[in-house]
Regions:
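Polybasic/polar functional segments that serve as interface/processing modules
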Residues: 1-115
Length: 115
């Protein structure tokens, strides 16, 4: 379970990433494309070309965790730069993973009620 401390930075890898990559491939992308240490304790978030899938990479000091989430409807809001990284807060990451625009927190899609 991901429970980083409050001092952990969350980095969005701008642009589209290859979602076929696993832990090692994404850690290499953190080093080469972002110029950061994937084992430094920060959280790194990657989005696929279609925009409906993100992968979250985090090293907790003991090992690397990889979390993936695909939206059933809609797309994850992503920064406009095509390269580099954008730092967001832990709360903004929570909004993003819930399908909410982290720049202006309002629900972007609500499932239809059952019944």
């Amino acid at each position: 379970m991901m429970l980083p401390s409050s001092g952990v930075s969350v980095w969005l890898a701008a642009g589209a990433s290859d979602m076929r990559r696993g832990m090692n491939g994404l850690a290499l992308q953190v080093q080469q494309a972002l110029g950061r240490d994937p084992h430094g304790g920060d959280v790194f978030v990657f989005r696929g070309k279609r925009g409906d899938l993100v992968k979250v990479l985090w090293h907790d000091g003991l090992g690397i965790s990889l979390y993936a989430k695909r939206l059933e409807r809609g797309r994850f809001i992503w920064p406009t730069p095509t390269d580099g990284a954008v730092c967001i807060t832990w709360a903004q990451l929570g909004y993003m993973l819930e399908g909410i625009d982290w720049r202006n927190p309002q629900r972007t899609w609500r499932p239809a009620s059952a019944g």
